[in-house]
Amino acid sequence: MEGIENIESKDFDIAEQLNLRIKLLGITEIIDNKLFERVHPCLVKNNTYIANVGGVMNAVILDGKPVGESVLQGEGAGPGPTSSALMSDLLSVLRGNIKYPFGIASNKRNKSAIYDVNNYVNSLYMRFEVKDKSGVLSQITKQLAKYKISIQRLIQIPDNIKKKASIIIITHNVR
């Protein structure tokens, strides 16, 4: 699990410039018949449903075959809604009302293989705060090339007063 404590206001501003939003997402999926679960900040396109869920509202997007995508939305942020939802969910699991509380039948949960997070493939957002001088970008891209990391988007934002720059890189999918 990774929270938003390392995200700075500058990252939100940069995301907005890129027509993206930063959202804390919980992701559960079955990959190669193994359970993958993760909570972490994600960049999502501004025009997606999840990007526009805000305030005390939370949403769950279920995507399955052959039904496609379904969205469940309701209050879930803030002390009242969060504690109420948490207690309700815990009681439902304890009473056995939820047959698949973690995406897999309860009686098979212990037998489930867990997908190795180190094998997960996704794109990455990187922000480097550097001195604004020649050769710095070249050093960064050489290191990325060394590890076969391909750049999808690159932006350099100069700070002429401090003689520094922010270099923002969004990669293609990497492992």
Residue ranges: model-predicted function:
Residues 1-52, 57-59:
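Substrate-binding/catalytic subdomain of NAD(P)-dependent oxidoreductase enzymes
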Residues 2-10, 57, 77, 81-88, ...:
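Conserved active-site and cofactor/substrate-binding residues in soluble primary-metabolism enzymes
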Residues 27-29, 63-65, 129:
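A generic structural motif
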Residues 33, 56-58, 66, 122-124, ...:
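A generic structural signal for well-ordered coil/turn residues at beta-strand boundaries
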Residues 40-65, 76-80, 145, 151-162:
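Low-complexity, glycine/alanine/valine/leucine- and proline-rich hydrophobic stretches
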Residues 50, 72-77, 129-133:
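Hydrophobic alpha-helical bundle architecture
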Residues 63-64, 69, 73, 78-100:
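Helix-enriched interaction subdomains in cytosolic or periplasmic regions
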Residues 85, 90-175:
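A conserved regulatory-domain signal marking ACT and ACT-like small-molecule sensing domains
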